[in-house]
């Protein structure tokens, strides 16, 4: 167990902001058709976490999956509070990035996105459902135990 406030990992900030929530290590997910935008529930019946919710969680996801429409769904989820508080990934995810950017531009709501090196990503994912705080600046970001 990591002490509250202790740094867990550092990475490259893809989108600035701060987000705190219980981590949800998850396989690739499409927000378009894979998640109910109203409550954040995973509705993709083929997904390992079917029935879980992304609402208020720190998604620890290697990369997204799906169409460009997923950006619109993510932006709407951030607006209505059914989206994740932060996304931690191991690869630059343009679709998720566009969704987070749209949420800030249109609604003034932020969802930080942090890219980690593969080893750091696997270490964070292995922590499981623990409270995390993700803080992203313009270039760098960090994850701390919450």
Spans of features found by a protein language model:
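Phosphate/diphosphate-binding glycine-rich loops and adjacent basic-rich segments that engage nucleotide
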Residues: 137-146
């Amino acid at each position: 167990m990591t002490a509250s406030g202790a740094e867990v990992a550092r990475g490259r900030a893809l989108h600035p902001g701060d987000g705190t929530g219980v981590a949800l290590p998850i396989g690739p997910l499409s927000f378009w058709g894979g998640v109910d935008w109203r409550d954040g529930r995973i509705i993709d019946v083929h997904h390992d976490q079917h029935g879980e919710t992304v609402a208020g969680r720190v998604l620890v996801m290697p990369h997204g999956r799906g169409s460009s429409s997923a950006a619109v769904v993510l932006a709407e989820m951030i607006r209505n509070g059914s989206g994740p508080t932060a996304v931690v990934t191991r690869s630059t995810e343009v679709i998720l990035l566009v969704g987070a950017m749209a949420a800030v531009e249109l609604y003034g709501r932020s969802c930080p996105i942090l890219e980690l090196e593969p080893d750091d990503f696997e270490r964070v994912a292995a922590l499981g459902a623990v409270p995390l705080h993700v803080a992203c600046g313009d270039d760098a970001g960090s994850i701390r135990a919450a």
